[in-house]
Swiss-Prot record:
This is CTP synthase 2. The gene is URA8. Catalyzes the ATP-dependent amination of UTP to CTP with either L-glutamine or ammonia as the source of nitrogen. Plays an important role in the regulation of phospholipid synthesis. PROSITE patterns: GATASE_TYPE_1. Its EC number is 6.3.4.2. Its cofactor is Mg(2+). It catalyses: UTP + L-glutamine + ATP + H2O = CTP + L-glutamate + ADP + phosphate + 2 H(+).
Amino acid sequence: MKYVVVSGGVISGIGKGVLASSTGMLLKTLGLKVTSIKIDPYMNIDAGTMSPLEHGECFVLDDGGETDLDLGNYERYLGITLSRDHNITTGKIYSHVISRERRGDYLGKTVQIVPHLTNAIQDWIQRVSKIPVDDTGLEPDVCIIELGGTVGDIESAPFVEALRQFQFEVGRENFALIHVSLVPVIHGEQKTKPTQAAIKDLRSLGLIPDMIACRCSEELNRSTIDKIAMFCHVGPEQVVNVHDVNSTYHVPLLLLKQHMIDYLHSRLKLGEVPLTLEDKERGSQLLTNWENMTKNLDDSDDVVKIALVGKYTNLKDSYLSVTKSLEHASMKCRRQLEILWVEASNLEPETQEVDKNKFHDSWNKLSSADGILVPGGFGTRGIEGMILAAKWARESGVPFLGVCLGLQVAAIEFARNVIGRPNSSSTEFLDETLLAPEDQVVIYMPEIDKEHMGGTMRLGLRPTIFQPNSEWSNIRKLYGEVNEVHERHRHRYEINPKIVNDMESRGFIFVGKDETGQRCEIFELKGHPYYVGTQYHPEYTSKVLEPSRPFWGLVAAASGTLGDVIKDINLSEGNENE
């Protein structure tokens, strides 16, 4: 097993996740099987209860693990399926060590950071790195490890020490370190001092970088590269210029041009890893597909505008998987994507009274969009604005996709304005004692724990069965006319089964349900170009080269190409089945 560690210095949020994902993707083009581990040095057990406005989105895995958003990057770039154990947090590793101490596993010894915690980290990495993550079912050849945060922070100290020891445990030819640093440009001059200081700190902790990936707003000058190489004690070929590009999908090719993979191939002796001809051909095809995808991205002229009506729009990372899914779909449709960010509460009449400009600007964005997306979320703020957006899309014939909460607000809007129940709502927003039974469109799922927040939702990969007589459905056609699909869930509330008949009698058809036939998973509005909602989160399974079908449908409908896309999908799926 080969290990490539990606660490960061100077500041956080510097792009370690994209660089780690891009490095892994390039290793896959050699035919290698690649896995990934993210280390997050915070005390939380997982990301499930963390505010999206503070930490960005919570990414959900097949096994229901609620993890850091970077695991989404790994899955999207590498085409792999990770588990909750691929995300190590301080809280998780401390809990593991304390549980072992309580069981008496340490035989009465004084339990310490070194060696007990650091050994536990190393054991965890070695165990998880061997878990198969792709459709081959085989043990990976390379593990990318991203160390979150900034080297030198007190929170990451145990992990840095564990990795220092780990490099000797596995051997130099099996361990490489890429350090990501910032090269700011001040008054037109590229400054290397922050990188020099970061590498000095890293070396003082016992970690020697094999490559230094320099993040900069512009291409590095040759003199800057030489200066970093000289003062950081590396060769110029070990300094990688990771300047800003118009899309993060260009980063793998940017690294490829600078011979990063050639260096890692030599440094880790990757030529000794046994590969079949099929492995090498699959890797070569991946590179070709990626190059074609980026070329299509650059050559696209037509623009598709999607209004994203959310409640966490002040931090775009809150909807990272959603925006990436829209990007994947747009590239597949050969369109340039323009996301119109609309804060849901700004669509509400109360905003007009307080700030007319904000109100009118938000409605102008919504009305100019080619398609409308209402993503998931929690709480009451902005709900009425989302309902108004769903109403606009339904009445105006604008393509619409509602995800999780988006499905629920679309159902509430339909119950209010089509069925004629103006007081319809959700028991999430109003106590059930304040809602008449017939007005409870969305209810708390009976099996969910109301007392505890962490890890108590309906989580992970679950089946959705397409219902009889749903062959007309666009969303079913987008999935290739299959009988069932498996998608990831994260919710506590569901459509009230008691209102389903009334909704369906007016054309609001629940074309997909769970295996019991009671829990509503997908709806589609008959007679509308594309008005779809999913209780699950399709954005969690979208891949760069294989977009999520509901998002693909939204962008295709917004581009006027839905019929062609469905035809192509059915031809492709039909050929595969023959």
